[in-house]
Structures are given as C-alpha cells and as structure tokens.
Amino acid sequence: MQYRRFGRTNLKIPVLSLGGMRFQKSWDQLDFSEISYEEQNNVENILNLASKYGLSHVETAKYYGTSEMQLGMGFKNTKKIPNIIQTKIPPNSDPEVFERDVMTSIEKLKVKRIDLLAIHGINTSEHLFQAIKDGGCIDILRKLQKENLIGSIGFSTHGKSSLIEKAISTNLFDYVNLHWYFINQENTKVINLANK
C-alpha cells in the first residue's frame, strides 16, 4: 500500500481509503435493532477484508444515515479498528448542538478518539461563518482536541473555489476534502493553495 501525508496532519494515509457513505441500511437514523444480521454482517466482512489488505483509513459522516452506528458495531464485533478514523459533522449556528453531534458520533463509532474530524459541507459563506466565528464550531473542536477526543480538524466542501480559498486562508484547518479528479480539475488552484 502506498501512503501520503494528509494535509498538515502528519498522518500517513493510504492512497486507497474505505469510504463509509454506503455502509448504511438507510439514510435515516435508525435503531440498531432495525439492522438485519445480513446487513451488519456485510459491513463486518468488508472491515475484515479492508484490514487484511491494509486499508487503514475509514471515513464516514453524521449525515450518512446508519453508517457511523454500523461501523461502530463492526469495529466492536470484528476488533478491526482502523488506524485512522474520520467522520464529518455539519456546521451548526448553535455550538451546543454541534458539540452534542460530535459526542454522538464518538459514541456511535464506539471509539475513544476520532483522528480526523471534518466540518461537513462548508458550501456557503454562512457555513464558513458558523465554523470560524468566536465560540463557533472550530472553538468547540479545539476544546475537544484538548480533551483528546479528536485529532486533526478539517472540512469537506462542494463549494465554489473562492469559498474554499477563503476557508483555507483562515489557517484554522489541517486538511480539506474536496472534489478533484481527471474530468473535474476546477479546484487545482485551491489544491495548490492548500499545499502551501
């Protein structure tokens, strides 16, 4: 497996990661009793294979329905906890709600610490403001870092390049998850800025 440094985290992340967006029975938040044995077993089989082949980074999000819960049960049942766990929490104008969402994700994932915590979907100026304002999401995450509940702080986005540049320029984030691939290289300038 090849590895790369992830943003300014100093974490060596595999070039292939295990994305948790489809590790869910439903986009809705369900009780675990509503997950069938077969549905959960599928998640656990994939975790076992991922571990076998060196996929040491798992990424999920609060908005991915039952994904965090199913991955957490999978980590517990298989004892295959990846080296790097990442989840994403949407920004919120109420810092108490945001903090509660982070704590719920830690609980669902059944871990003591989330290595990479991204503010999910900084897609508008309002989202960025909620993240960076005094007493906002970033301040909550800094507090949780001091408590060793989370590691590095980043953001994900489908926003315009100008907004992404503005977020990177705050120097408050350790990494960014964004779209960039062969047929869509619109964010090349932003990637170059992030590499500085």
Where are these regions (language model features)?
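Beta/alpha (TIM)-barrel catalytic core signal, keyed to glycine-rich beta->alpha loops juxtaposed to Asp/Glu
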Residues: 3, 122-196
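Active-site groove signature of glycoside hydrolases
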Residues: 106-129
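Alpha-helix-loop-beta-strand connector modules within alpha/beta enzyme cores
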Residues: 68-87, 137-148, 196
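Short, acidic/polar
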Residues: 32-50, 94-110, 158-168
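Structural preference for beta-strand elements that scaffold enzyme active sites
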Residues: 3-5, 13-17, 55-57, 82-86, ...
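N-terminal binding-site loop/beta-alpha segment at the start of enzyme catalytic domains
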Residues: 1-83
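Acidic (Asp/Glu)-rich catalytic clusters
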Residues: 7-10, 72-82, 103-112, 166-171, ...
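Active-site mouth loops of central-metabolism enzymes
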Residues: 22-41, 87-97, 125-129, 156
